[in-house]
Amino acid sequence: MNQTRVLLIFSWLTVATLLWMDWSKNKNETLEISASHNLGVDSNLELEHAVPQIHAGAVPLQKDSQLIAAAPKVPVINVTTDVLQLKLDGFSILAADLLRFPQSKDRGAKPIKLLTDDPNYPYSATTGWVSQSNSPVPNLSTFLPEQPDVSYKLANDQNRLVVPFIWTAANGVSIRRTFTFERGRYAILIRDEIRNSGETPWNAYVFRKLSRVPIPNILNRAMTNPDSFSFNGAVWYSEKGGYERRAFKDYMNDGGLNREIGGGWIALLQHHFFTAWIPQKDQASLYLLAQNGSRDIAELRGPAFTVAPGQTTTTEARLWVGPKLVEQITKEHVKGLDRVVDYSRFQLMALIGQGLFWILSHLNSLLHNWGWAIVGLVVLLRIAMYPLSASQYKSAAKMRKFQPRLQQLKERYGEDRQKFQQAMMELYKKEKINPMGGCFPILIQMPIFFALYWVLVESVELRQAPWLGWIQDLTTRDPYFILPLLNIVIMWATQKLTPTPAGMDPIAGKMMQVMPLIFGVMMAFVPSGLALYWVINGGLNLLIQWWMIRQHADFSRKRSRENIK
């Protein structure tokens, strides 16, 4: 095993990984639409506000056409904050535009539509009540705004905006629902206050649901679009199970989720953005995944409430509608919510990704440019790994010096590879050359390289972030292929400085010769930020290797002169 072989293995592993990711995406690109699924529920719970005994059909699922036909006309309220523009009624947020995130960098580009009332691809967040013991509950036609025909807008001197709805039953039970929006915040607090002014107990359970018809291009992308590999589907978190996820294409193939969880959350993820229901920590809910025609549904059912006459009770939850901004997500203080920035489903790789982003974000705060932050990250990593890299460069310099002697050994032993290997190892031992000296630094860089790929793909902070000149979005590929071409030149020059081991298999040698071209082609399809990292890293590696070879040559000449004297 030598440095060249390790580099060859690393190169092919990188290419194979990206090809596998592309193959797996294309293999399942057709959305599997199942028939309507209704899930049964375990009911052996003994919590104060326990998840209710819910049977299949408790919340009947209807076909999309039935939902549209059955939907009554209700007042729709428009709400505008500094970050969100929404349409909502008493039950659902029907549409949500992210005002700080345009769809493109074109002048006048419209904002990203995260939730939408598009009849072909609806995506909404809903919360309501299901009756138990024949208690009356609100529906779309009776849960009404306290101030109809009013549009709400967060004023410049306001930090909070409250939008109230009210429902009152004939038996004296009322529910006052408030949507609370805060300046600069994507988490919406939805609070229900149930007041029983009647004469009989009121029994019902709350449900909270995310429902969408996935847009086909979410599932039908290609390697030429780096965000092809971003996870799209449902994720949830629990103290016991940790972070779990299921892609839209596998929504029901792995069996319906049917689990009682307290202190968790559930979300629907897409590239750079997500929606999530975050219930109260002290209230358990039943977590469900279901499909209704073409709709994918993530739902929380429960807890159940019994409100005695003359009593009042409340329940609340946060609804996140927005980007995967690490700083804002952290401020919510919700355990595990940072995993929605899905660097990897594997905890170790996710931790490496989080660490890299932490360094990048601090460098960006100093340099005010994510591209230069990537350059700074490369420099810091090279400094941190220099003690390891130094042995690699020294080993390469020694190998270069003794290359003629190795060639002589090869000619001496001809086809007898066993004797040649023995003589070569004796030479290595005598001259204190470590043929494995270059392996460790390369192996260390492998997880960093893959983790950084996901950081650049997943970090919405880098979305549409420019570097300089032709690079105007670090999360998309280089439009003019300048960085891939530079990478080819740098790899070719590095190969010229690195001696080809004597006795190297001719096929492996030819593969190494074409490796710069293979890597260059690969870099043409990855985010330009990753190509920038690889070019800067390779350039620094080339300079340091050239300097080490020169230093070693000067040292050898000095020793030769001393020996002559």
Curated annotation (Swiss-Prot):
Its main location: membrane. It is found in: Cell inner membrane. HAMAP family: YidC_type1. One of its GO terms (cellular component) is plasma membrane. Belongs to the OXA1/ALB3/YidC family. Type 1 subfamily. Required for the insertion and/or proper folding and/or complex formation of integral membrane proteins into the membrane. Involved in integration of membrane proteins that insert both dependently and independently of the Sec translocase complex, as well as at least some lipoproteins. Aids folding of multispanning membrane proteins. The chain crosses the membrane at residues 6-26, 348-368, 370-390, 437-457, 479-499, 516-536. It comes from Xylella fastidiosa (strain Temecula1 / ATCC 700964). Interacts with the Sec translocase complex via SecD. Specifically interacts with transmembrane segments of nascent integral membrane proteins during membrane integration. This is Membrane protein insertase YidC. One of its GO terms (biological process) is protein transport. Keywords: Cell inner membrane, Cell membrane, Chaperone, Membrane, Protein transport, Transmembrane, Transmembrane helix, Transport. GO terms for molecular function: membrane insertase activity. It is a multi-pass membrane protein.
